[in-house]
C-alpha cells in the first residue's frame, strides 16, 4: 500500500511541477517577442532570490539545519534581443553548408588515400 501511495505522490508532484512550468510559459510568454522575454527575465531576477532565501529559512526552521548563504546571482549585462535565435541561426547556417563541406572533406580524404596507396 505504501509504495502505491508514494508513487502516486511522486506522480502528483511531477505533474504539478510540469503544469506550473507550462502555465508559467503560457502566462509570461518568454518564448515570444524579445521585449516580453526581457521583462520576464527582469521579473524573475527580482522575485526568485527572495523566494529562495525565504524557502531556505523555512527549511532551516523546520529541520534545524544551517544552510550557508548562497552567493548573489550573476548579473547579465546584455539584451536578449541581441542574441535571440542566434543559436538557431548558427545551426541553420551550418546545416546549409554541410553538403558542400562534406563533399570537400570527402574529396580531400579520397585524394589522401590515393596518395598513400601509391
From Swiss-Prot:
Record keywords: Membrane, Mitochondrion, Mitochondrion inner membrane, Transmembrane, Transmembrane helix
TM regions (residue ranges): 8-26
Membrane topology reported for the UniProt record: Single-pass membrane protein
Function summary: Component of the MICOS complex, a large protein complex of the mitochondrial inner membrane that plays crucial roles in the maintenance of crista junctions, inner membrane architecture, and formation of contact sites to the outer membrane. Constituent of mature MICOS complex, it is required for the formation of cristae junction (CJ) and maintenance of cristae morphology. Required for the incorporation of MICOS10/MIC10 into the MICOS complex.
Subunit composition and interactions: Component of the mitochondrial contact site and cristae organizing system (MICOS) complex, composed of at least MICOS10/MIC10, CHCHD3/MIC19, CHCHD6/MIC25, APOO/MIC26, MICOS13/MIC13, APOOL/MIC27 and IMMT/MIC60. The MICOS complex associates with mitochondrial outer membrane proteins SAMM50, MTX1 and MTX2 (together described as components of the mitochondrial outer membrane sorting assembly machinery (SAM) complex) and DNAJC11, mitochondrial inner membrane protein TMEM11 and with HSPA9.
Family as reported in the entry's similarity comment: Belongs to the MICOS complex subunit Mic13 family.
Name of the molecule in the record: MICOS complex subunit MIC13
Source organism of the structure: Sus scrofa (Pig)
Organism ancestry: Eukaryota, Metazoa, Chordata, Craniata, Vertebrata
Amino acid at each position: 500500500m505504501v509504495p502505491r501511495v508514494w508513487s502516486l505522490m511522486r506522480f502528483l508532484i511531477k505533474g504539478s511541477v510540469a503544469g506550473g512550468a507550462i502555465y508559467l510559459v503560457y502566462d509570461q510568454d518568454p518564448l515570444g517577442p524579445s521585449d516580453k522575454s526581457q521583462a520576464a527575465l527582469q521579473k524573475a531576477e527580482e522575485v526568485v532570490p527572495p523566494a529562495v532565501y525565504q524557502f531556505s529559512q523555512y527549511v532551516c526552521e523546520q529541520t534545524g539545519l544551517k544552510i550557508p548563504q548562497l552567493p548573489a546571482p550573476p548579473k547579465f549585462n546584455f539584451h536578449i534581443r541581441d542574441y535571440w535565435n542566434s543559436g538557431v541561426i548558427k545551426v541553420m547556417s551550418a546545416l546549409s553548408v554541410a553538403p558542400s563541406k562534406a563533399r570537400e572533406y570527402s574529396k580531400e580524404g579520397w585524394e589522401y588515400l590515393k596518395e598513400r596507396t601509391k
